[in-house]
Amino acid sequence: MEDNLPPELKVLLRRAERVILVANNPAISAGDFDALALGPRDVVVSFNTAVKAELLSAETVNVFVHGYHGQEFHFFGLPCRPCITRLFEQSPDRCFTLLVGVVNPMSALPRVAIYEDRIPLPTLLDYPRMRPSGKPFAGPSTGFNAMVVFDWLLGRPGYTYELFALGFSNEAGTLWNGHAWDYERAWMHASRVRVIALESAGKRWWWPLRFKGKKAK
């Protein structure tokens, strides 16, 4: 898994203080991003269409994860929207792409990681395949694939970042019924991933823990 990552991204991840996974949740606001006080040692991970890409900054490391749509033979969110393309143009050495669920051989491009379906980590290999009704699940969500990979990296030498999830707390939006969300949420809450509540959900319980008394914005 680690070998799949571009060498430049591995260097930045070893230096990172935080890796923050951002869900495609419409309830995420500019205030939620401002409250994180993001800086150059933060890695921000977005998924597929990256609906909150307008809030991203070229100051951070940005990773864009795209899942493969097997029935329509394309990656969700590609080609990127103009606001994402601008980030790659402004900060090409700090923007990376992860392609998940690749089913046919592909040649890696600079700053692009390729993961085949399915990523050989126990949490993903054990992912439910069938519903009680007998209807199959589509497999792990793009965000869950990335979350498990970044959590796994924390067990490898040299990676010491804190892992956060923003917008994975179900404040708004809908969940596509093709994924085993109960399995994904149960794993997340039992893992070392720290779920950040959105401003709309009330007081941020994690704020004093992360910023050790610094005044919230």
Task: Label every PLM stretch briefly.
Residues M1-K217:
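Metal-ion/cofactor- or nucleotide/acyl-coenzyme-handling active-site neighborhoods
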